[in-house]
C-alpha cells in the first residue's frame, strides 16, 4: 500500500520515511517532519487570520471532495514506502500521532488524514493575571521590593515571616494588638508571627551555650533581681535569647531596636507574646525609631536603673529628654564602637554621670564578634543582595580594625583583589604585612567594583567619591552608624533612586551611571543577612556579665567613667564556650604559677596584654 503525505504549505519538502511497528512515543522522531511542515498541517487557532490569506502558490484547492483539513495529506501529494508493518486496531482508521501532538487518521484506502485536534488552554489563576496583566492596586515601597525578590534578600524567607496582605502595609503604631494573655504593652509588626519566631529562638539557643549556662545558675540565685533594664540593640533571635536569660536572672526588660532594618519581625512578635515590652519592626521610619525608644523609656510607674545600648542612641535620648532618670540609673553597658566613642566624649566633657562598661573593646568582643562574625557575614550579605561572584573583583575596605580584618580576609579567600585605606600607621602596617595594598580612596575609587566602610567615622565616602565611582559599583557599610557613607548627599533632584530588591537601591546619575547602594548605608550584615549565632553568644554573654557586674558592684568601685570588662570575666566567657569544641585546658602547677607570678585560676594575662 502506498501512502502519500503532504502539507498544504510544504508538500515538496517532506522527506520519505518508513513507518515501523513502534509505539507512538517511539514513532514520533521517525516521522522526520520539519517544524514548518508540522505547523502547516495544523489549522490556525480560532480559524486563522482572515485578513492574511496564504500566497496563491500555497493556497489550498477549492472546496470539494477530499478538500479541507482532511486533504492536507492526500495521496496525490507524494509517495512514501509501504507501511507493511503497521498494525491496525481499528478496521477503519489507524491513529498516528504527529510531533506536535496532533493525530493522523489512516483510512482503509491508505489515505492519511489529520484528525480534529483539541485546543489546549492554560488555566490562568487570578493571582497570576494580577501579577502579569495588572498593576497592583496598592503597592508600598517595601511590599514591592519583597515581591521582586523576597527569597534571596530577606534575612529569614518564609511565608510565616512576611505577608503581602493589606494589613502588612499598616503601620504597627496604628494597630491595636494584644498577646494571648491580653497584654498590649508592645508594638510589633504582627503578633501572629510569634509561633514562627519562637522556633527561631529555640534554634538559636542550641548555639548559645554560655547564656544557657547562666540560666542554670539562675535557678539558685537571681543576680539581677530588681534590675530594670532598658535596651536598644538589634532584635534578632540571638538577642531574644539574651533578653530571656536576663529575665531568668531576675531582670525586667523593655526593648527597642538600634537599627531600622535589622529587626526580625517574627522574633519581636515571639518576645511580645512572652510578655516582653518590645517596640520594633523591620523598616521603621526615623520618626518610628525615636518613638519606639521613647515608649521604652517614658513609662508611667516604671523607670529603668540599667541601660544596655548599641550605638549610643538610647543613652543620647535619655540625656536629651529625661536627664533626671540618671539619678536612679546604676550604669550603662555599650556594645559598639560608635556608642563607646560617644561615651568617651561625654566623659571628656564631664557630662557622664554614671559608670559605663565598654563591651566593644573587651577581648571577647574584639577578637571574636568583630573578627569572626564579620568574616562570615560580609560574604553572606553581599551574596544575598547582589548574587555577585567575588573572584577577580576589586574591593576597597576602608578601615583595618578587627571588622576590616575580617572583611579583608574573607574577600581575599574568595579570590577578590583587596585594597585597604587606613589612618593608623600600626593598623596600616598590619594590612601591608597581611598582603593587602594600602591606598588612599581617591587612588582607586574609579576602578574598584565594591566599596566597604568599617571605620566608625563619618563621611568616609563622600559625594565626590560617589560621583567618581564606576558604573554599577557596589557601596555598603559594615560599621554601626549610617554616617560613614554620605547618603544624604545622594538625595537630590538630579539623582534617581530605584528600589530593585529589599535593601538594594540603584542611585542613577543623569548620564545613566548608577551605583548599587545596600541597606541605605546602614549595617550590611544585620540588615541584609544573618550572623553566626555561636559568635554572638560570646558577645551576648559578655553583655550579661557586664550588666551583672555594674548592677551588683558596691558603691565606689566604679566612678563616673568608662571601664573595660575585668579580665577575669573575659576569661570566664571564653571558658563557657570551650566545651562546645570538646576542648581541654592545661592547668598550671603550683611551681609554674609561682614562676609566672599568677593565680592558678587566672587572670592569666595583664590588662595591657594584646591578644
Swiss-Prot record:
GO biological process, one term: S-adenosylmethionine cycle
Binding sites annotated in the UniProt record for substrate: 236, 310, 335, 365, 369
Stretches the record annotates as LISN domain, inhibits interaction with ITPR1: 2-109
Location, primary (coarse class): cytoplasm
Record's compositionally biased regions (Low complexity): 1-14, 40-57, 68-78, 145-164
UniProt-annotated location(s): Cytoplasm; Microsome
Tissue: Expressed in parotid and acinar cells (at protein level).
Record: residues binding NAD(+): 336-338, 370, 401-406, 422, 457, 478-479, 525
Alphabetical list of NCBIfam families matching this protein: ahcY, PRK05476.2-3
Family: Belongs to the adenosylhomocysteinase family.
Subunit and partners: Homotetramer. Forms heteromultimers with AHCYL1 (via the C-terminal region). Interacts with ITPR1; with lower affinity than AHCYL1 and maybe via ITPR1. Interacts with SLC4A4. Interacts with ZCCHC4.
Protein name per its UniProtKB record: Adenosylhomocysteinase 3
Lineage: Eukaryota, Metazoa, Chordata, Craniata, Vertebrata
Gene that specifies this protein: AHCYL2
